[in-house]
Amino acid sequence: MSETKNVRTLQGKVVSDKMDKTVTVLVERKVKHSLYGKIIRLSTKIHAHDENNQYGIGDVVVISESRPLSKTKSWVVSELVEKARSI
């Protein structure tokens, strides 16, 4: 009865941290066009939960799927891959 569930994870770049305890992550993926065969880049913006407001714009993070936390938020930031370079 103790089955483990595979959790979906995605990697993306933080593009907004203006909301409290929430970051907007831009996830890019490459897809082959069905008719022409050209490789194109598609992107999706996902709202993710950031409990301690510790991630900033430009950080590369890994997000994992969770239960719905609000109307638009059902992902949680799980780890930091690369910190944004400060000028």
From Swiss-Prot:
GO terms for molecular function: rRNA binding; structural constituent of ribosome. The keyword RNA-binding applies. It holds the Pfam family Ribosomal_S17. One of its GO terms (biological process) is translation. SUPFAM superfamilies: Nucleic acid-binding proteins (SSF50249). One of its GO terms (cellular component) is cytosolic small ribosomal subunit. Keywords: Ribonucleoprotein, Ribosomal protein, RNA-binding, rRNA-binding. InterPro entries: NA-bd_OB-fold (IPR012340), Ribosomal_uS17 (IPR000266), Ribosomal_uS17_bact/chlr (IPR019984), Ribosomal_uS17_CS (IPR019979). Belongs to the universal ribosomal protein uS17 family. One of the primary rRNA binding proteins, it binds specifically to the 5'-end of 16S ribosomal RNA. PANTHER family: 40S RIBOSOMAL PROTEIN S11 FAMILY MEMBER, SMALL RIBOSOMAL SUBUNIT PROTEIN US17M. HAMAP family: Ribosomal_uS17_B. Part of the 30S ribosomal subunit. This is Small ribosomal subunit protein uS17. It comes from Neisseria gonorrhoeae (strain ATCC 700825 / FA 1090). The gene is rpsQ.
